[in-house]
Amino acid sequence: MPSMTRKTRIQPIEHAAEDDDNGYDRPSKSQLKREMHELQVLGQALVDLPKDALKRMPMPESLADAVREARRITDHEGKRRQLQYVGRVMRSLTDDETAALRTALDAQRGVNKAATARLHWIERTREQLLANDDALTEFLRQHPEADIQEGRTLIRNARKEAQQGKPPRYFRELFQWIKTAGGTSNADDEAADDAGDDHDDDEA
């Protein structure tokens, strides 16, 4: 009898525990994979941000360093590996830190969307003013605070410099005149300025 007692084993219980662990293991790995992918997407969004916008992101220094390094790398494979590293660094963030980053990115995207729409409106208005004299009357009706004499002078000079093939000085000043008369927020103002300068440089 004592020998039979010694042979009593508990492996079946251990196996059952292992089976339970395995039962939860697969969804846990899938969830981890999804979370890692989401963090890499978030990291890619950080890497793609304009430099000034990146400075406003609430990041710990370790993540900021990893993102800056990814921006610096031009080799495709090297950048891919660095982006994976950015994702791993982001796994060390707390939920609150990750949420703060997402909120800041969403806010930045909203600013960019509004600024882009604003830029397109200014450009369309400039085209209309240069193409049709009646467009100035309509613009002044909607924006009575605008300086009509300055607007007329800029339109006349922009048309003349285009005909003569000169650098688009007044063309750019007309952009600023429309933007000022139309009114805009500081964030949109800076973004429209940057985008407007880029477009004008292309046109030049």
From Swiss-Prot:
Residues 1-34, 182-204 are annotated as: Disordered. Its main location: cytoplasm. It is found in: Cytoplasm. Transmembrane segments: none annotated. It comes from the Bacteria. GO terms for cellular component: cytosol. GO terms for biological process: assembly of large subunit precursor of preribosome. Residues 187-204 have a biased composition (Acidic residues). One of its GO terms (molecular function) is rRNA binding. Keywords: Cytoplasm, Ribosome biogenesis, RNA-binding, rRNA-binding. Disulfide bonds: none annotated. Gene3D superfamilies: PSPTO4464-like domains. Residues 23-34 have a biased composition (Basic and acidic residues). The keyword Cytoplasm applies. Belongs to the DarP family. HAMAP family: DarP (MF_00765). NCBIfam families: PRK05255.1-1. Member of a network of 50S ribosomal subunit biogenesis factors which assembles along the 30S-50S interface, preventing incorrect 23S rRNA structures from forming. Promotes peptidyl transferase center (PTC) maturation. This is Dual-action ribosomal maturation protein DarP.
